[in-house]
Amino acid sequence: MKRSQQFCPKKRKGGYVDMKKKILQTVLFLGIMFLTFYTLLHGQNLSEIYQAVKNMSVPYLIAAAGLALFFVCAEGSMIWYLLTSMRKKTDSQTTVLCVVGKEKVCSLWRCIQYSFIGFFYSGITPSATGGQPVQLYYMNKDGNKGSDSTIVLMTVAVIYKIVLVVLGVGMLLFCGGALKTELQSFFPLYLLGLALNTVVVAVVLAAMLFPQWMIVVWAWVEKQFIRLDIWKANPQRMDKVQTFTGNYRNAVDWLKQHPGKLIVVIAVTFLQRCSVFLLTYMVYLGLGQAGTSIQEVVLLQASVYIAVDMLPLPGAQGITELMYRSVFAPVFSKGSLIPSMLISRGLNFYFLLLAGAGVTAANHFLVKKKI
């Protein structure tokens, strides 16, 4: 069996992703998007909204778009940085060429493409679960070692979650009172989002630091579920858990040997997180707003992001827009609130989603052409 086949669904005619699942995800995504914008725009003066969007300052619009692109490109740069570092240790033993057509693709640009592909599939799947498997597929297809690709993607994902949790906890500790006042009825959702992210980080850290303990706990949980007739006995579940813990353990071993790489990834991830929060402030300035500090706008946007990050909705659509409209109502003037949401959300999600769709389509065409 080829390496790439070990990390992706079995191929079928028309693509490696099951077509029915693909159609269902698309319908769900478009349905939620339609309901979201219908709810938000119903009863609004569309001509005024259009005029406000049209009057957005071009320099600030470019700056906001640049921050959106930086968000995705930063992940690609981390993939490239880690993958290149891991390949250096194997170059003396074997040379692995990653080729699409006749060009090497283990470059910064190729890794940025992986990031756009991951963003697209994460955006159209519930809880952003579809991105990494597809990234892994293309990385393996390019000739990267499956073990290296897995460690790189897991490291990026873990640091992403850890930085998000640290930011969320820091905001709660130092700005808890202000958050509760500003978020009002959405404050419990913020606490839920932070709690869910914390649980994920705790589970992942346990898998990395105490893999045997995790396996024992899982075996006990599985036994209870089988006893209650919730699950049927299936040895493949334990195999998946052992693979899961083994992969994270490999990531830990590699990071222990390269602590400097870990520091770089943490720093870049922090900047990546802040870029998407700062984007909203660029929109705020671009719409001619004043009176609210950059710290407050960034804090509010970060709270929205943390609250919806783990919700099982494609792209966290619907709840993100509704929470934004409520939280930023005191910040933007009445005529600028909806336009600001359309611009900021349009740039940090839909614009990147379209870019990711374009990159994905181009890569899909190239893969089919090679086959």
Language-model segments: what does each one mean?
Residues 74-116, 283-300:
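Membrane-embedded helical hairpins/re-entrant loop segments and their flanking transmembrane helices
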Residues 2-3, 9-47, 51, 118-231, ...:
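Transmembrane helix-loop-helix hairpins in multi-pass inner-membrane proteins
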Residues 48-53, 139, 244-256:
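A short amphipathic helical element positioned immediately N-terminal to and/or at the very start
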Residues 55-65, 253-267:
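Membrane-interface helix starts
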Residues 16-88, 92, 102-105:
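Anchoring transmembrane alpha helix of integral membrane proteins
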